[in-house]
Amino acid sequence: MIKKRKKNPYEASASGFYISMSAHKARRIIDQIRGRSYEETLMILELMPYRACYPIFKLVYSAAANASHNMGLNEASLVISKAEVNEGATMKKFKPRARGRSYLIKRPTCHISIVLEDISYEEYEEDFLRRI
């Protein structure tokens, strides 16, 4: 049974499914941006020379748009609180070879989920709890 995570009112998320790249290559990028601020993450992703950066950049940008449009959160105070990559289904196709043979080609896919959290509300809650 999969446990559903409790939804924090100051969190926004975006998920991408069946992205055609290896989960190992996507994890290399995700490990660099986990825990960083939104603006710093965008700068890092724009400057990294890997093909995996573009779909991750789009997901981070989409999660920030969800935060600002749906919840009214400020993009300057967003931090990547959770970023994970899971393996998806592997697409298989045959490449024709000489003498009637064929070789199997495997195209790995992955599922990426990004969660952004607003840290300004965290400070507000801590201050509120100290007063009580």
From Swiss-Prot:
GO MF, any single term: rRNA binding
This protein's UniProt keywords: Chloroplast, Plastid, Ribonucleoprotein, Ribosomal protein, RNA-binding, rRNA-binding
Membrane-spanning intervals of the chain: none
Pfam families tied to this protein: Ribosomal_L22
CC annotations in GO: chloroplast; large ribosomal subunit
Subcellular location: Plastid, Chloroplast
Primary location: plastid
Chloroplast in keyword set: yes
Free-text function comment from the UniProt entry: This protein binds specifically to 23S rRNA.
Subunit architecture: Part of the 50S ribosomal subunit.
Family to which this protein belongs: Belongs to the universal ribosomal protein uL22 family.
Protein name as annotated: Large ribosomal subunit protein uL22c
Organism from which the protein derives: Populus alba
Lineage, top ranks: Eukaryota, Viridiplantae, Streptophyta, Embryophyta, Tracheophyta
Gene designation: rpl22
